[in-house]
């Protein structure tokens, strides 16, 4: 049975999930997280502890640059690659980038604004950043790919309906899903980073700071007069969530009437009531926690634990859902 290990690398935390099975039926074999900034040592521990030296490993890419363009839908499929390449070269030339230093991938989907064209979402990476990240692993590790997390997170969405996936990690990634495919990714420098830093100033422990965050409860009764009584970290949490809400509204307003559903995932999704809190601040949308679609979960494991490592689960799917 095929197995793959997904690893999501952030500044102060590394999340991992090992999956096995086939495209139609995947199961989480093991999962967890490591804390700290010595990524090379932490990754070595993860590979050893999950016995994954002979399995495909998928990690999140660093320094991703997203662009959107389009190609004509009447083209034959065999001509898609060339058409996208031409569009990519135009973008590179316009922005005066150096193509020899870059690599790119793309996803095609229906164009919500023009039925005669296909929407193209480009993910552009610097080769140097890819090499630096690959060097965190030993030569014996089977590094399958480096995937943009804003794209791979869509692996866990099982509906054809348009939606936003808001992945709240140290930064936040807002992925727009249309016709089952990601069409745009917005990365914002607001997420759990400031919250963790604030808590860590008191707790002096990154791992403990994350546990404090996961045990937080957001108030939802009176949104006009939010009470911080008895919760010293609530102000910073509410402040960061409000910034994220503002960004979500901006995304929704750019495509009016399209998005009626928001899914929250990542570390931020483990804050109790976060989905209700966000839903009450945005008109005419439903907000829920993103449960990993198509993944067999163990009944004895709380869904909150899987949601916390959704970023890693979605990466592992890249090697198994082919």
Enumerate the predicted regions with their spans.
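N-terminal phosphate-binding loop and adjacent alpha-helix
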Residues: 26-51, 74-80, 303
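Glycine-rich phosphate-binding loop plus the immediately following alpha-helix
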Residues: 131-150, 179-226
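Active-site neighborhood for divalent-cation/phosphate handling
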Residues: 62-159, 294
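Glycine-rich phosphate-binding/hydrolytic loop that grips phosphoryl groups
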Residues: 150, 157, 288-322
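ATP-binding/phosphotransfer module of carbohydrate and carboxylate kinases, centering on a glycine-rich
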Residues: 256-262, 271-289
């Amino acid at each position: 049975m095929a197995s793959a290990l997904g690893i999501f690398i952030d500044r102060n935390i590394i999340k991992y999930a090992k999956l096995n099975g086939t495209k139609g039926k995947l199961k989480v074999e093991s999962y967890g997280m490591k804390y700290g900034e010595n990524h090379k040592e932490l990754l070595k521990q993860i590979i050893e502890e999950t016995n994954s030296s002979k399995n495909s490993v998928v990690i999140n890419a660093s320094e991703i640059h997203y662009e959107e363009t389009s190609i004509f839908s009447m083209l034959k499929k065999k001509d898609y690659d060339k058409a996208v390449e031409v569009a990519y070269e135009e973008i590179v030339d316009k922005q005066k980038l150096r193509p020899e230093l870059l690599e790119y991938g793309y996803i095609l989907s229906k164009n919500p604004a023009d039925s005669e064209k296909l929407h193209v979402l480009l993910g552009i990476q610097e080769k140097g950043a890819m090499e630096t990240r690959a060097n965190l692993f030993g030569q014996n590790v089977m590094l399958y790919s480096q995937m943009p997390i804003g794209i791979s997170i869509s692996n866990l969405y099982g509906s054809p309906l348009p939606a936003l996936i808001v992945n709240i990690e140290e930064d936040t990634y807002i992925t727009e899903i249309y016709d089952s495919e990601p069409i745009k990714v917005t990365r914002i420098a607001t997420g759990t980073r400031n919250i963790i830093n604030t808590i860590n100033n008191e707790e002096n422990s990154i791992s403990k700071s994350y546990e404090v965050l996961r045990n937080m409860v957001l108030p939802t009764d009176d949104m006009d007069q939010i009470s911080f009584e008895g919760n010293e970290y609530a102000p910073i949490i509410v402040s960061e969530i409000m910034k994220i809400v503002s960004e979500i509204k901006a995304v929704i307003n750019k495509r009016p009437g399209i998005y009626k559903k928001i899914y929250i995932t990542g570390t931020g999704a483990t804050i109790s009531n976060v989905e209700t809190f966000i839903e009450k601040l945005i008109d005419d949308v439903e907000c829920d926690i993103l449960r990993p679609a198509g993944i067999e979960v163990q009944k004895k494991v709380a869904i909150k634990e899987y949601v916390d490592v959704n970023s890693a689960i979605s990466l592992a799917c890249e090697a198994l859902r082919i």
